[in-house]
């Protein structure tokens, strides 16, 4: 289902924990990370599509989250031709998205990346709100920045507010999985029900793979 300009209606999800950290999913068998997202089916509202995609990609149900806010209008990104199927080239241009900001009220162990037979992610983690977007595929970075910026006004204030970076450097936190930077990560060991392990790692690639693989 495309609009007149060739954009597919879509929803994006920024999922927060109690520390204002955001959920990142690692795309299946790839090295890129992203937020949950997916197309709006015919007859669905954006909210209905959001709850469906949330469950399909993270295993969470409506009772596990609280809606904090959403973008006022559609945010668009174009997809390069090399990522578009040949049969729809010339018609399909990209995605137009409504973004939702959710607060997780469930537990980390409620997240299940294999809630369907066709998982989108094979690992996940919590990350700082204003993290550099180096690990996001390039053509999505601008719309991610727009969504994060617009929805940041809904973050808790003042004690847990995630401050917007200033100056010429757009973002200031350690990379998701790039340049060496000592950081403390809170991730889930899926072999232990509802328990969290603090792991010291310089980069995401140095983590024990079994620890970050989703259940």
Curated annotation (Swiss-Prot):
Q: Keywords in UniProt for this one?
A: Hydrolase
Q: Name one Pfam family in it.
A: NUDIX
Q: Needs which cofactor?
A: a divalent metal cation
Outline the extent of the Nudix hydrolase domain.
Answer: 6-149
Q: Enzyme class, one word?
A: hydrolase
- Top-rank taxon of the source lineage equals Bacteria
Q: Does the keyword Hydrolase apply?
A: yes
**Which molecular function GO terms apply here?**
pyrophosphatase activity
Q: Which family does it belong to?
A: Belongs to the Nudix hydrolase family. RppH subfamily.
Entry function: Accelerates the degradation of transcripts by removing pyrophosphate from the 5'-end of triphosphorylated RNA, leading to a more labile monophosphorylated state that can stimulate subsequent ribonuclease cleavage.
This protein is called: RNA pyrophosphohydrolase
């Amino acid at each position: 289902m495309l609009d007149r300009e060739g954009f597919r209606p879509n929803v994006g999800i920024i999922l927060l924990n109690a520390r204002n950290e955001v959920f990142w999913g690692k795309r299946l068998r790839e090295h890129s990370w992203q937020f949950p997202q997916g197309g709006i089916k015919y007859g669905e509202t954006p909210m209905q599509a959001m709850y469906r995609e949330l469950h399909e990609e993270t295993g969470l149900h409506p009772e596990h989250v609280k809606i904090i806010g959403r973008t006022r209008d559609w945010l668009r990104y174009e997809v390069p031709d090399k990522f578009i199927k040949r049969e729809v080239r010339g018609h399909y241009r990209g995605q137009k998205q409504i973004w939702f900001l959710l607060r997780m009220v469930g537990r980390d162990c409620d997240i299940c990346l294999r809630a369907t037979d066709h998982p989108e992610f094979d690992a996940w983690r919590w990350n700082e709100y204003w993290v550099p977007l180096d690990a996001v595929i390039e053509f999505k970075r601008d719309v991610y920045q727009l969504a994060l910026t617009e929805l940041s006004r809904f973050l808790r204030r003042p004690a847990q507010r995630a401050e917007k970076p200033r100056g010429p450097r757009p973002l200031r936190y350690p990379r998701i999985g790039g340049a060496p930077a000592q950081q403390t990560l809170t991730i889930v060991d899926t072999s232990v029900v509802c328990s969290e392990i603090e792991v010291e790692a310089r980069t995401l690639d140095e983590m024990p793979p079994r620890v970050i693989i989703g259940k």
